[in-house]
């Protein structure tokens, strides 16, 4: 998915609803065993960093999940990516443990979406 303003791309992200095999090896505990969406990658254009685009992206992800009847979102990020870990925690994601993916340790996060949340009402 792309988030843009006019002809400018502000952000790019990949959302997958098929699960992630490496999440089965979590060293820790997921918040739920419900079907979930995975945000595989998110990149914000340098011109748009610090403008809340990541938070807008997560709101849109939650709205898409609600439309699909999915109430769990999982994300992993490199252990050294303090900025993304901050963005995840700021947007209500809880740290669940670590996984081994792509030859490195990743920090894994999950957020539960309220079932009665509507558009712009997800938590």
What are these regions (language model features)?
Residues 44, 50-63, 86-90:
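Conserved acetyl-CoA-binding loop-helix of GNAT-fold acetyltransferases
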Residues 49, 75-85:
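Conserved beta-strand-loop-alpha-helix junction that forms the acyl-donor binding cleft
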Residues 14-41, 49:
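Conserved acyl-donor/pantetheine-binding loop and adjacent beta-alpha core of acyl/acetyltransferases
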Residues 1-16:
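Conserved beta-hairpin
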Residues 76-77, 89-108:
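Conserved catalytic-core motifs of GNAT/GCN5-like acyltransferases
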Residues 58, 65-77:
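Conserved GNAT acetyl-CoA-binding A-motif
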Residues 1, 35-37, 105-109:
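Short beta-strand micro-motifs in enzyme catalytic cores
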Residues 42-44, 77:
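Hydrophobic adenine-recognition pocket in adenosine-nucleotide-binding enzymes
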């Amino acid at each position: 998915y792309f988030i843009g303003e006019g002809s400018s791309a502000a952000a790019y992200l990949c959302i997958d609803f098929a699960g992630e095999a490496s999440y089965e090896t979590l060293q820790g505990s997921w918040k739920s065993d419900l079907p979930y969406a995975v945000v595989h990658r998110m990149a914000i254009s340098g011109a748009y960093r610090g403008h809340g685009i990541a938070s807008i992206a997560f709101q849109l992800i939650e709205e898409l999940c609600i439309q699909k009847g999915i109430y769990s979102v999982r994300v992993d990020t490199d252990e050294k990516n303090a900025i993304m870990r901050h963005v995840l925690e700021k947007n209500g994601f809880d740290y669940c443990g670590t996984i081994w993916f792509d030859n490195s340790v990743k920090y894994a996060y999950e957020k539960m979406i309220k079932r009665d949340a509507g558009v712009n009402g997800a938590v």
